[in-house]
Amino acid sequence: MEIRYIDQSDDLIEISNIYESSWKYAYKGIIPQDYLDSIPTGRWASGIDKFRMNNLVMIENGHIIGTASISKSRWQQYSDYGEIISIYFLPAYMGKGYGKHLLKKCIEELNIRGYDKILLWVLEDNQRARAFYEKNGFSCSKNYMNSNIGGKELREVMYFIE
C-alpha cells in the first residue's frame, strides 16, 4: 500500500471515477438517485487537476483505490484549521481498514503544513462516515451548513480534531 500526492502520470479520469463510484455507493438513499445516476464520467477531473498539490491517492497492487483532498480551511472563522475536504474509495475497498490509513496520512500532511486543528464536513445522514470519523478521534461540532444536492436540501455537520 502506498499513499502519495497525485503526479502528472496519474489518470485524472480514473481518480474522478473513485469520486463517482463512491458517491453512487455511499450516498444511495441520501442524495436523490436520479442525481447520482446522472453524474457524468470525469466530473471531478478538472478540479483534481487544478488542485493537484492538495490531492492524495492510495495505491494497492498497482491500482488507485482511494483519494483524498486536503487544504487550509476554506472557512474564514476557522482560518487556523486545516481541512479534509474529501476522502473517497472504490466501494470494494470500503470498510476494510484502508480509510484509517488515508485519514492518518491526511492528518500528518496537514500537521506538516502547520495545522494542529483539523475540520471536515459530513452529510448529517451519512451515518457510516460519521461513525468512521468518530472512531478515529474526530468530534461532532454543533456547526451545520445546508446544501442543496440534486434538488434535495441536505445538512452537513462539521467534525474536528484538535
Identify what each model region corresponds to.
Residues D10-D11, G97:
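Short helix-adjacent coil turns
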Residues S86-K104, N111-R113, E124-A131, K135-N136:
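Conserved glycine-rich acetyl-CoA-binding loop
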Residues G82, D116-L119, L123-R130, E134-N136, ...:
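C-terminal "cap" of GNAT-fold acetyltransferases
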